[in-house]
Structure formats: structure tokens, C-alpha cells
């Protein structure tokens, strides 16, 4: 192999007692793993998201539920995955639902903390929308929790609120989380 990352990963596996030269199932793993991480870690520019004027008569809450995502824990480089929910009260603008998904994908394609993921997504949406209120919640399974130590199972929840909902504290978060 002429790929330094693949060579380093093969050496790492060898240190763990896994020989890529003699185990045919592992033979191409270092190359594939290096390619996967390159694809994952090379961050594209933030997607362009254009807000459009709020339609006449609009102005009620916009709720986008169950947006799937996956990312890698920055501490262990193992997956965490789940669903993100976004709710906002438009002031003057809205965005297409697909735009929220593209921003979520952009935020999650790097080693990440769940708590930072919701903050980054909330910041990006707040910048584009300038809403009256915004809430981003994320419910995820953390493989670092499930694969290490006591192998704890369960979900973790992180939230970020902006505008009126941030000023009202966590009560609005609890209500919207129950939707």
C-alpha cells in the first residue's frame, strides 16, 4: 500500500494482534477504512440555504421531526446516531425542509459531540431564518456508551433553544420534546 493512512491503520491493527497480511477478510480493511474516514472527515463548505419570505397568513410554528443523522464521537471515533427535531416560529422567513436536512448532514460529518451538534445546527438555522423562536433537539444512541465500560444502553438527549424559547427556559423545550 502506498497510502500512509491505510499503512498506519494496518500497523494499528497489527498492534492489536490483527494481521491484515495473513487474514484475507482483513486484507483490504486498512484501505477501505482510510477511504471511509477521508470521505467522512473532509468537510465540504456549508451548504447554501436561502430563506424565503413568510407566506401571507403564515406565522405558526414550523416543526420538522425525525430527521435521521449519524456522526462519530469525537472522543472515541465510534458512531452515534439518532434523530433531530427542529421547531421554529418564523419572524419573516422560512426555509425548505430539505435545507434543514442538508445543514444537519453538514454539521454531523465530522468528529462531533451531540451537544455541539445541536448548537451548531441551531446557530446555522438562526443565522438564516432569524426566527422569533427556535428549538433543536437530538435523541441519539451513543456507541461509546454501549461499547465501553459497563456497556450502558439508552438514548441521550441534547437541546439548544434560541429567541423567545430560550428566554422562556426549558419548559418550552419539555413541551415540544413531547410532540
Stretches found by the model and what they are:
Residues 1-179:
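A domain-level signal for the structural core that forms small-molecule/cofactor-binding pockets
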